Structure formats: C-alpha cells, structure tokens
C-alpha cells in the first residue's frame, strides 16, 4: 500500500507574509482556494498547454466554494513569448471587462511565464490587487512562484519591466507534475540543484543520490525537493524581499542564462532553443568555470556540479552559434550590474556563492569563447 504524500507548508515572512502549500489534490480543495479571495471578482490566467488540463477543475472548485463569484478564464499561447507588454495589456482589458474592483483576485495557473505575467498584472491593476500562484511546473513551484518578483520581457532583455508584488498564497498541487513533459521536469530540477549549489551541501549530496527517484517522479522525493527548495528561497526572501543584499545569490547562472535566452530567442513548445531551466544550467557551469579561473572555486567542485547537471540530462555547454560578444552585450544590460560594470553571482564551491562586482570582461569573454 502506497503511503500518502503529506501536505507540506512553508511560510514566507515578507510584508505581508504568505504560505506555500505543497501536496497532492490541492486543486480539489475548495476551502483552501476560496480563502484566498476577498472580493466578488476573480480571473484565472493560464496558457494553451495547461488550461485544457486544469482550468476547468480550478474554475469548478472556486465556484463550488463561492457560487457568487464573478469568475473568468483568460488563456494565452504557451511559451516565453507570451510574457509581453501586449499580453499584459490584454490581461488588463480582461479585468476591465470583468469589472474587477480593488478586492479582486487573479489566479496564475501555469508555469513561470503565466506566474510572472499574472503577478505584474496584479501589481498594476488599481495599484495592486491580490493574486494567487497555482504553479503547475516544477520550476515555478521551486522558484518563480515564490518571492514576489513579477515582470514581462521586452526585445532588449528578459524581465526588464516589472515590480515586486508578493502573492496572497502559493498553492502547489504536485499532482500536476504527472503531466509535465520530461524536459520541463529537468528544467525545474536545474533550479533545485541551484539551491544545493549556493547554500546547502547536504541537499546537494541528497540530489546526487536521489536522481533516479526524482526523474521517475516519485511523489515523496519530489515533495521533499520542492519543500526544501522553497524553505531556502523563503529564508532568503524573508530577509531580503527587494533584492538589496543576499537575495541576489539566487541568481547563480542567471546572468549567463538570460543572455543565452535573449540571444537565441525564447523557447516555445517544440522549439530546440534552451528553455529557462536549461539556460540556467549552462549558466551555472559557466559561472563555476569563471569562478575557478578567478581563483574563487576549486576545479573539482566545478566538475562535480557539471557532472550532476549532466546526470539529470541538462545541457552544460553553450549552444553552437552564439557569439561571445553578443552574449556580453546582453549581459551588460543585466539588472544586477552597477555603474555599467558587470556584477555576477559567482561560486565558492558546493554550498557557497557570492556577488562579485566589477568582473573583468576579458575573463568572461574567454569563458564564453571556450
């Protein structure tokens, strides 16, 4: 007899605090979902991959608990290209048509793209309304749904237009991971590995020994990976909600990764372009190699990180055809830079990272070229 996976809960102590609920069956929990709604209007935002599977269930559960609710569903095409100013405007128009007031609530049903767009829409409508993250990808469960960063992309860069706006709650129904494509599961595991790499050697070792169970979607292993990742992010975000200090460490691999994404073009369903988790995996290896070159991290730890990412089926080398100078141009636009100088999150070995200002571009160029 299979032991049921217990519900896990993680509190994020930002102003205001909120709770991350992690476990199976949460899309079928009317009291939990209804408790997040203060007013009479709600809008579910989802995408063309997720909505056919889960939007009707969320819609039904909400109306079962709140029959008086004015509730619509807005579905966007799947993929990073939907995280645009155009679709932000379309979501705002949906709220206007709904007649949403300041006590309305948005539900982000999907991955990081939907979560970011929904959060930014909530931050802007009437100067800020509630939204609930209902992540359906592993990457969104462990990273983008937690912390209150919201944004859309522009052609010049990823997440360039955004706001800090914490969700009212995060409700992560782990049953949705059963339908997640393997490539997307691996992308989420890239962000899970990041937490071990930057601050938890014990978790890093656990990921080395639990690979088969995680890739096989063992419910207990996945719940543990999600909960531990969320605990790490909640701990950091609770102390640094606006990324003025240590929260920047969560960006290990992201400066390189965002440059890869914007240079190659954003990944869409069926595309061979690297998705976010894959680009971060490559970025972590590049950051580790640069750290080794600068004398910050031991070479054997860099090799250990690369081997772990390889073992999970993640890419660890730059895609062919990306020019170092083009990538550097994108990196110069990164939000973490100071006074026009590169500021990168680099590595001190397994379990340790630091933000390094004024990184030598020649050293970065050499890493990108090799």
Curated annotation (Swiss-Prot):
Lineage of source species: Bacteria, Pseudomonadati, Pseudomonadota, Gammaproteobacteria, Lysobacterales
Binding positions for Zn(2+) per the UniProt entry: 191, 254, 276
Signal peptide segment: none
Pfam families assigned: DHQ_synthase, DHQS_C
GO biological process per UniProt: amino acid biosynthetic process; aromatic amino acid family biosynthetic process; chorismate biosynthetic process
Cofactor: Co(2+); Zn(2+); NAD(+)
Function: Catalyzes the conversion of 3-deoxy-D-arabino-heptulosonate 7-phosphate (DAHP) to dehydroquinate (DHQ).
Protein family per UniProt: Belongs to the sugar phosphate cyclases superfamily. Dehydroquinate synthase family.
Gene transcribed to yield this protein: aroB
Enzymatic reactions: 7-phospho-2-dehydro-3-deoxy-D-arabino-heptonate = 3-dehydroquinate + phosphate
EC number: 4.2.3.4
Organism: Xylella fastidiosa (strain M12)
Protein name per Swiss-Prot or TrEMBL: 3-dehydroquinate synthase
């Amino acid at each position: 007899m299979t032991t049921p996976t217990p519900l896990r809960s993680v509190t994020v102590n930002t102003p205001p605090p909120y709770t991350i609920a992690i476990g199976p069956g949460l899309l079928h929990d009317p009291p939990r979902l209804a408790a997040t709604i203060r007013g009479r209007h709600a809008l579910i935002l989802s995408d063309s991959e997720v909505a056919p599977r889960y939007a009707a269930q969320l819609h039904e559960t909400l109306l079962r608990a709140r029959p008086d609710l004015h509730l619509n569903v807005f579905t966007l095409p799947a993929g990073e290209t939907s995280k645009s100013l155009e679709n932000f405007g379309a979501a705002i128009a949906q709220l206007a048509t709904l007649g949403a007031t300041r006590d309305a609530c948005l539900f982000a049903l999907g991955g990081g793209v939907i979560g970011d767009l929904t959060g930014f829409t909530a931050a802007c409508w009437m100067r800020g309304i509630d939204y609930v993250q209902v992540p359906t990808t592993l990457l969104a469960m462990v990273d983008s749904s937690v912390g209150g960063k919201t944004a859309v992309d522009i052609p010049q860069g990823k997440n360039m237009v955004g706001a800090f706006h914490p969700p009212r709650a995060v409700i992560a129904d782990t049953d949705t991971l059963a339908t997640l494509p393997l490539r997307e599961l691996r992308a989420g595991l890239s962000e899970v590995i990041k937490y071990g790499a930057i601050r938890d050697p014990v978790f890093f070792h656990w990921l080395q020994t639990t690979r088969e169970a995680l890739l096989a979607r063992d419910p207990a292993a996945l719940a543990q990976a999600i909960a531990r990742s969320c605990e790490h992010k909640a701990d950091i975000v609770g102390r640094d909600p606006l990324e003025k200090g240590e929260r920047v460490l969560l960006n290990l691999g992201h400066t390189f990764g965002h440059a890869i994404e914007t240079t190659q073009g954003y990944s869409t369903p069926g595309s061979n372009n690297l998705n976010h988790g894959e680009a971060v995996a490559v970025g972590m290896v590049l950051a580790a190699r640069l750290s080794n070159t600068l004398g910050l991290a031991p070479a054997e730890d860099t090799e250990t990180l690369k081997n772990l990412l390889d073992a999970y089926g993640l890419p660890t080398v730059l895609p062919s055809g990306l020019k170092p100078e083009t990538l550097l141009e994108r990196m110069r636009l990164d939000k973490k830079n100071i006074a026009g100088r590169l500021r990168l999150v680099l590595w001190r070995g397994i379990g340790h990272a630091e933000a390094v200002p004024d990184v030598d571009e020649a050293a970065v160029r050499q890493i990108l070229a090799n």
